[in-house]
Every structure is written in structure tokens, then in C-alpha cells.
Design a protein with these regions (language model features):
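Accessory alpha-helical/coil subdomains and C-terminal extensions
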Residues: 103-179
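Loop/turn elements at helix/coil->beta-strand transitions in domains of secreted/extracellular proteins
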Residues: 50-51, 179
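Short Gly/Thr/Asp-enriched flexible loops that form oxyanion-binding sites at enzyme active sites
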Residues: 27-50
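ATP/NTP phosphate-donor binding region
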Residues: 1-17
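Structural motif
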Residues: 23-24
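Short, charged beta->alpha transition segments
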Residues: 14, 38-43, 170-173
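Internal gly/pro-rich beta-alpha loop/helix module
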Residues: 54-132
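Hydrophobic helix-cap positions at the C-terminus of alpha-helices
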Residues: 15-18, 44, 79-82, 176
Length: 179
């Protein structure tokens, strides 16, 4: 819960500065704000053609039954995976958790008590890990342009989420918008 937009900027800067040195990136992250970070990075890294995989664990990595070791090892394997032409199999920002690789900007944390904590409700999983990793290639975004990576650092944090419903009063909206 300590993650803030300044830290997203730092992550983008680190990825941009090291982009040509690595085939992919794995970010170890706390679970409470992981989906927010993944979504933000997906929009801040324009022209991405390498994997950026966020992962973490429900139990600390030193605990006997931790899910962290498997999440980390599989994230590294996915981040390094390439096709026969040497291109990344998953060139986008993702979350890997409990055997599922999900698009970063389509993932939500749903459960703080189970290992299967994240879901992608409006988009299918990009890969599923078992004995083998099965990639859902038809759903994976591929950057077909030859655009170089463009990092975006400007973020507007003056936002509000307004849920509309039948019967909402105009004065409620005006108060929330400060007008």
C-alpha cells in the first residue's frame, strides 16, 4: 500500500535505462497495489515489445508454504521466453499469480486469503502454467509497429471515481467535482 505514482515513474525509468540489456523484466511487488502498478505501467511504457511481469506472494517467501517461489520462478521463465525468431512470447505488462498470466491492465485483486488472489474478468488469461506453460497466443498483444520504447512520466493524480446510478442527484455530482 506504499506504492505511489512516483514509484511507477522510477520503475519506468529503470526499465527504460536497462531496456537493451535484458530480454524481459520481473518486478516483485506487494499484492495490495500490484494491479494498480501493472495497469499504470502498461500505459506508461508505449511501444513495449518485451515482457514486464509483476508477481508476488500471499505468504512471505521464507514461509514453508509460500506461493512466492513458484510465482517468481515461473515469472522469470515467462519473461525469458522467446519464439523461434528470438522475439518475446509475451511482449506486454502482465501479472503472474497462482499459475495464471494475466494482462496487467485487465487484472484485479479479488482475494486476500487464498493463493488464487487475482482475476481477469473481462479478458482471458494469457498463459497457464502447469507441467508446461500454455500460451494463449491469440490474446497476447504484439507490438507490430517498429516504434522504439517511449516512456511516459507525466501522470495526473487529480482524478475521482464517480459511480453513476439511476436517481443520483445533480448536487451530489457537483459537490464531488467541486463545481
Amino acid at each position: 500500500s506504499d506504492m505511489e505514482p512516483d514509484m511507477w515513474r522510477k520503475l519506468v525509468h529503470i526499465i527504460h535505462e536497462n531496456y537493451d540489456l535484458y530480454h524481459g523484466f520481473v518486478i516483485l511487488h506487494g499484492t495490495d497495489t500490484m494491479a494498480y502498478t501493472a495497469s499504470a505501467l502498461s500505459f506508461m511504457l508505449e511501444g513495449l515489445d518485451k515482457p514486464v511481469i509483476l508477481t508476488g506472494s500471499q505468504l512471505p517467501i521464507g514461509v514453508l508454504r509460500t506461493d512466492g517461489k513458484e510465482n517468481l520462478m515461473t515469472s522469470i521463465e515467462i519473461a525469458a521466453a522467446q519464439d523461434k525468431e528470438g522475439k518475446a512470447l509475451v511482449p506486454e505488462v502482465c501479472i503472474f499469480f497462482e499459475n495464471h498470466l494475466m494482462r496487467g491492465n485487465r487484472t484485479t485483486k479479488m482475494n486476500a486469503e487464498n493463493f488464487n488472489a487475482f482475476r481477469s474478468f473481462n479478458y482471458p488469461v494469457l498463459a497457464e502454467a502447469g507441467i508446461h506453460i500454455k500460451y494463449n497466443q491469440a490474446q497476447i498483444h504484439v507490438n507490430k509497429s517498429k516504434q522504439e520504447l517511449v516512456p511516459h512520466y507525466l501522470l495526473d493524480t487529480n482524478i475521482v471515481v464517480l459511480k453513476l446510478f439511476p436517481g443520483i442527484q445533480e448536487n451530489v455530482i457537483a459537490t464531488m467535482l467541486g463545481t
